[in-house]
């Protein structure tokens, strides 16, 4: 006799968090609900950008579009944005979240700042 399988219902989530980690080499975006459960994520390296192209604003924009499209089934409307790192993809990723239809409730910079910890990398001289 055939067994009846229950369909797993997708959670309807109204509000969530977006974590943007913008380093000098890559941009990683993670979208979670308010409890911290991951709904979707994307990175510029995972989307096919390689080398120096990973750290461009266009790559960050594409990453944000992909991450938002992956979490469309959850019905996310409002987000709190947490930005970490000094990368160039910070502003373009935040701007893309707004154009993709998400209402940005707050933007927080959570970049860790050392209290005179490790010695920083030497500055580039080109």
UniProtKB/Swiss-Prot annotation:
PROSITE patterns: RIBOSOMAL_S11
BP-aspect Gene Ontology terms: translation
Cysteine-cysteine disulfides: none
Keywords in alphabetical order: Ribonucleoprotein, Ribosomal protein, RNA-binding, rRNA-binding
InterPro entries linked to this entry: Ribosomal_uS11 (IPR001971), Ribosomal_uS11_bac-type (IPR019981), Ribosomal_uS11_CS (IPR018102), Ribosomal_uS11_sf (IPR036967)
Gene Ontology molecular function, alphabetical: rRNA binding; structural constituent of ribosome
Signal peptide: none
GO cellular component: ribonucleoprotein complex; ribosome
Subunit relationships: Part of the 30S ribosomal subunit. Interacts with proteins S7 and S18. Binds to IF-3.
Family: Belongs to the universal ribosomal protein uS11 family.
PANTHER family associated with the record: 40S RIBOSOMAL PROTEIN S14/30S RIBOSOMAL PROTEIN S11
Alphabetical list of NCBIfam families matching this protein: PRK05309.1 (NF003698), uS11_bact (TIGR03632)
Role played: Located on the platform of the 30S subunit, it bridges several disparate RNA helices of the 16S rRNA. Forms part of the Shine-Dalgarno cleft in the 70S ribosome.
Protein name: Small ribosomal subunit protein uS11
């Amino acid at each position: 006799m055939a067994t009846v399988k229950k369909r797993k219902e997708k959670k309807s989530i109204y509000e969530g968090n977006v974590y943007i980690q913008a380093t000098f080499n890559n941009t990683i975006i993670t979208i979670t609900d308010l409890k911290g459960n991951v709904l979707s994520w994307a990175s510029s390296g995972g989307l096919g950008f390689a080398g120096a192209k990973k750290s461009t604003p266009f790559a960050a924009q594409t990453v944000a579009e992909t991450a938002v499209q992956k979490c469309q089934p959850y019905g996310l409307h409002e987000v709190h944005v947490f930005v970490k790192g000094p990368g160039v993809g910070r502003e373009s990723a935040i701007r893309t979240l707004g154009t993709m239809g998400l209402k940005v409730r707050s933007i927080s910079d959570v970049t860790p700042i050392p209290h005179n910890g490790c010695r920083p990398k030497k500055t580039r001289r080109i």
